[in-house]
Amino acid sequence: RSIKAARGRILDRNGVVLADNKMVCTVSVIHNQIEEPEQVIAILVKELGISEEEARKRVEKYSSIERVKSNVDKTVGDRIREYDLAGVKVDEDYKRYYPYGDLASKVLGFTGGDNQGIIGLEVVYEEILQGDPGMILTITDAKGIEVDTAGERRVEPVPGMDLRISIDRNIQEYATQLAAQACATKEADSVYIVAMNPQNG
């Protein structure tokens, strides 16, 4: 199983974090390791807020590993882990988080559901931000089903590198406020602000 690497942060010129990571979890089940299917179904329904039909479909599916839900809040993932249910795996994952909301969002861009950059700086600097994923290595039988008694080996992921940019968060926030005021006052469809050094253009 793959372990996602923590994505590199995006910092402003003063080191203020504009794009960060929030730890979440991915919950999966391994059919041939489940000992109490009805208990597993009940807990997945209760903790993940999915329907009994959906939980049962995942639990009863014959596959090496079946993902039940991604981007699960870490507190929920920790609770599920505490049940210590045979055949239920809770892996830590990361979700992109922007502390200042949509500030400079057209420049920063954003990531998709797989945490890969799809627009803006997030995609332009994907190679340095993404890091290298790790792996959980397990032994499977001829059908690809994990052998529970064989144990597993973990190869840790390598986090992505941080990216420091020339934007100043304070100036950007001030410019955003001025643009909003001008847009409202002039009843404009859109507003653009250009910052320029008057000495050299």
Per-region residue spans from a language model:
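A short, well-structured edge-of-sheet supersecondary motif
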Residues: 6-13, 187-200
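Extreme N-terminal "leader" segments
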Residues: 1-3, 153
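Solvent-exposed coil/turn segments that connect beta secondary-structure elements
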Residues: 13-16, 23, 30-34, 71-73, ...
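Surface-exposed patches in mature extracellular/periplasmic domains of secreted proteins
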Residues: 52-58, 89-94, 184-196
